[in-house]
Each structure stands twice: as C-alpha cells, then as structure tokens.
C-alpha cells in the first residue's frame, strides 16, 4: 500500500504539500500533532516540546526522553504498517528508510523565499526577525535528527526525492511527489525486498492508533 514520509524546512510549503499529496492519493495525513495525541495515551506529554526545541546533550540521557523517542519510532512503523499514509516527520527517512514501499521526500527552498512565505503567512513586518526564527528552527531540527538518530536531515542518500519550492510551485511539487509515489509503489514488490508488511505492531499501540486515526492497523486486533 505504501507510505510517504515528508521532511520539510519551515517556510517551504511542506505542510501544505504533504496534505495535498494525501488528499490526491486518498491517503491519511499524519503530522507531529497526531503522534503527540497517540503518545499522550501512554502518559508521554512532552513530545512536541522535545520535537520543536532541539535537544540538549542532557536531554539525550533522560529516561523519559529516550522512552518518547522509542515510542515515536514504534508509532512511525505502526503507521507505515497501516499503509496509505503521508507522514510529515523530521525523522521518517531515518526510521522507515529500510523499507522498499516507503518513499522518503525532502522539501527545501532558499532562505529568501522561506522568509517571504513566513512573512506573508503570519502577517509579519520584520523580515530580519522572520529569518532569525527560521534559522533557529533549522538548528533545532538538525539537533533533533542528529542527536537522537545520528543522521543529518539534508543527507543526499536519505531521500528518494528532493523538491525545491524556490523553483517549483506547490501544485507542481504535489504532482511530483504523487507521481513519484505511484511509480515507487508499483516497483516496490520485488522478490526479497523488505516491506512494511513485515512490521509487527503491538496490539495496545494498534488500539491507540485506531482511537486517533479511526481505523485499525492491518493484521492486528484492537
């Protein structure tokens, strides 16, 4: 069935593109807020704070944080097992990169265009402040990926497709991702390839996902 992960820089239009791709393909759309709702069913309430802030070195040894990351990885795999889903995630490529039926996408844009988008979408007047905010967000993003996953969010081999919305419209980007997914999923059933169908999902987690997503993970009883 396939899963698409989308990693995007703030101000690139990645959220809109991910939602549009999901709508075009008839897939579910999942972002960090969805994952946070699932984690809260386990009493883990600090995911979004950790996700957005960029972890310190001390954060790496806190038991609660390590549990959050472990559970988040399980959630991403369980969502992938569900299939027909677009996951907006900084680390989807790191968690699901080994599956033949996962298309990992990176959305980027030059800083100047990102500033323009943020200024326009948030009604800001101070472009310098907007750029500073974007750079801080980039730093937090990179720290989260590097410190918890030992990966780099802009590594060339991490993605099957990279789209630059500095030169590509949101409409064209949506079309490119959807077409790439259709092509990738047609050729993913290669003999010996590891697919998301091999993922085993804990029944309790499957139930939590069903509560949030509205339908069960295939192959599980909730």
Over which residues does each language-model region extend?
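Small-molecule kinase domains that catalyze NTP-dependent phosphoryl transfer to phosphate-bearing small molecules
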Residues: 127-170, 201-218
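Short, polar loop motifs at secondary-structure junctions
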Residues: 89-93
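ATP-dependent small-molecule kinase phosphotransfer cores
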Residues: 35-87, 124
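Post-Walker A helix-loop "phosphate-sensing" segment adjacent to the P-loop in P-loop NTPases
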Residues: 24-30
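Conserved phosphate-donor/acceptor-positioning beta-strand/loop module used by diverse small-molecule
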Residues: 100-121, 128-134
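Glycine-rich phosphate-binding P-loop
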Residues: 5-21
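N-terminal presequence-like segments and adjacent domain-start helices
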Residues: 179-206
């Amino acid at each position: 069935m396939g899963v698409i992960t989308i990693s995007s820089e703030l101000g690139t239009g990645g959220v809109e593109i991910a939602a549009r791709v999901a709508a075009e393909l008839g897939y579910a759309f999942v972002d960090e807020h969805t994952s946070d709702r699932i984690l809260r069913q386990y009493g883990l309430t600090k995911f979004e704070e950790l996700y957005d802030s960029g972890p310190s070195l001390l954060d790496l040894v806190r038991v609660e944080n390590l549990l959050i990351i472990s559970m988040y990885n399980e959630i991403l795999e369980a969502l992938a097992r569900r299939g027909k889903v677009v996951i907006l995630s900084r680390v989807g490529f790191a968690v699901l990169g080994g599956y033949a039926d996962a298309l990992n996408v990176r959305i980027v844009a030059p800083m100047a265009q990102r500033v323009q988008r943020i200024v326009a979408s948030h009604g800001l007047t101070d472009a310098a402040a907007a750029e500073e905010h974007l750079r801080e967000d980039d730093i937090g993003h990179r720290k989260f990926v590097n410190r918890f996953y030992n990966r780099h969010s802009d590594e060339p081999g991490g993605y099957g497709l990279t789209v630059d919305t500095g030169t590509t419209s949101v409409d064209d980007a949506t079309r490119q991702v959807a077409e790439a997914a259709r092509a990738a999923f047609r050729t993913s059933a290669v003999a010996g390839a590891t697919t998301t169908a091999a993922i085993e999902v804990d029944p309790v987690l499957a139930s939590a996902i069903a509560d949030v997503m509205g339908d069960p993970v295939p192959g599980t009883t909730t």
